[in-house]
Amino acid sequence: MKQQQWCGMTAKMGTVLSGVFTIMAVDMYLIFEQKHLGNGSCTEITPKYRGASNIINNFIICWSFKIVLFLSFITILISCFLLYSVYAQIFRGLVIYIVWIFFYETANVVIQILTNNDFDIKEVRIMRWFGLVSRTVMHCFWMFFVINYAHITYKNRSQGNIISYKRRISTAEILHSRNKRLSISSGFSGSHLESQYFERQSFHTSIFTCLSPVPSSAPSTCRYTIDVC
């Protein structure tokens, strides 16, 4: 069966390229952000602005590169798991990748908004936004293939479960009918052996009765009647 293609690629090929793209894009993003976020500027919050939102914003700004590094490491692991999920057709791995990429890009947008004002050079701010928007758009493009392949994998797994369920039912029916035939045949053979046993017993009893000694006053003749079935 010919698989449907989009932009000259099947859903499986697009999913593989999505994982490869994510790994390469995350590496390039870390190289670029290490120079600009490595020495994050942390400023102490004055009591006037000591609110919950200000504390959270200051924490994100101070730990921005460490947060980006942690998220990128998790993203690379999930991308590798995506490639294995394509090979092994694991539906859960595809779903994890879809959910995580959405969370990863959302977190990067938040970090970008909070830290972009710290750079005085306008070109740096433009390059950071250009890289983030380009990566997000490409992830949306590749996500189309991942979602389609996840749908195909789920459908194939459902069909496989139905086939295995029907196979188990047919196997159980065959075993039940076989056991039923065996019980019927064993019943017939048992009744036949029982009838033969009683016939032999009656035959031996008649012979023993005929050969047993009789009184002298009784007739000396003995009639043998043997019925053979």
Curated annotation (Swiss-Prot):
Pfam families: DUF4534
Tagged with keyword Transmembrane: yes
Signal peptide range in chain numbering: none
Name used for this protein in its record: Transmembrane protein 217
Residues passing through the membrane, by range: 13-33, 67-87, 94-114, 129-149
Gene designation: TMEM217
PANTHER family per record: TRANSMEMBRANE PROTEIN 217
Membrane-related topology note: Multi-pass membrane protein
Disulfide bond residue pairs: none
InterPro entries: DUF4534
Localization: Membrane
Positions annotated as glycosylated: N39, N156
GO CC terms: membrane
Swiss-Prot/TrEMBL keywords: Glycoprotein, Membrane, Transmembrane, Transmembrane helix
